[in-house]
């Protein structure tokens, strides 16, 4: 659920050297670091099954599932799986519309991509609710989400009927509903600073069998819901087709879908990774999956896919619009940095994340121009100044929700290109 503010430490009194914005006195810092190193030298890593060997990872199949439920954007074979699935979605869409009495060519489509951003996910929640109220919110053929965007995505995919639940998800929670801090000793012997059992319970409460069945029903209409994680062993971004998982109706589908939403939000070292059991041939392995933000803060589909050309191979010519909800600002947040190691590192990481997100927008914009897709972007405006005292600050989230709701309800004027970093010579 990370964003450019993830260098803020939710529990500074417990972990002064963890995710840092303020460093302890030098002597205390040295003492803590020394103790940490001593403890770490005597600690064994948590047990796990072997990772998929290098060179075989593209062939791994999630235990109990079919091969084609996920895509690797840089692997030609897995990209072809996406192309095949997209063509299948066109067949399903055409068949569904024909049953509804539609004749002629397929109608224009809208796609929605929701970025990461931690508790800034309240922006997407408010915007979608306001968009419903305004009256022009489309039904999206494709919805994608990363990190907190992955948590928003199922609600957005299923439409206005789930607006109330989405609002509750992002305006009635606080940090205690997301994670529990661990003791220093537990941190040293475990795989993360925090226990995210509260978030798991929250996802379990909201993503139930009824929701999965509703998602499966949309698969039959040719719609797609995708979320992103990162396979940390292979250093590979992975795109998961939640609609296909739901429509398979296989045992374990619901648990896998929940696990993927948790994995997409699992900030490395802050929240535990999600271990996914896979198989290659008759051998069993385990993949370690973490926050999709590690590779990209927002995505639409593999850049290697020329969507317009793919559709035209089966005679489909249609208008396409892409809407991006960026759960973050575009302008950098100014701050005077203390001349100390940890604040410098924190600000540098924050800056890196900020510009990675902007780079993602440029990548997507380039693809939309190539594939003749209308680009539309919404983001948190620089005028939003509500204090952000801690992660998942309920007051902050409600204020952001209300702002986004108002923006959309009034009829938002979408930004048609990424921020200009180099002034035009024209």
Locate each region found by the language model.
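Sec-dependent signal peptide recognition
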Residues: 26-33
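N-terminal secretory signal peptides that target proteins for export/translocation
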Residues: 1-25
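C-terminal motif of bacterial Sec signal peptides marking the signal peptidase cleavage site
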Residues: 39-42
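Catalytic nucleophile serine of serine hydrolases
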Residues: 146-147
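Patatin-like phospholipase
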Residues: 44-141, 157-426
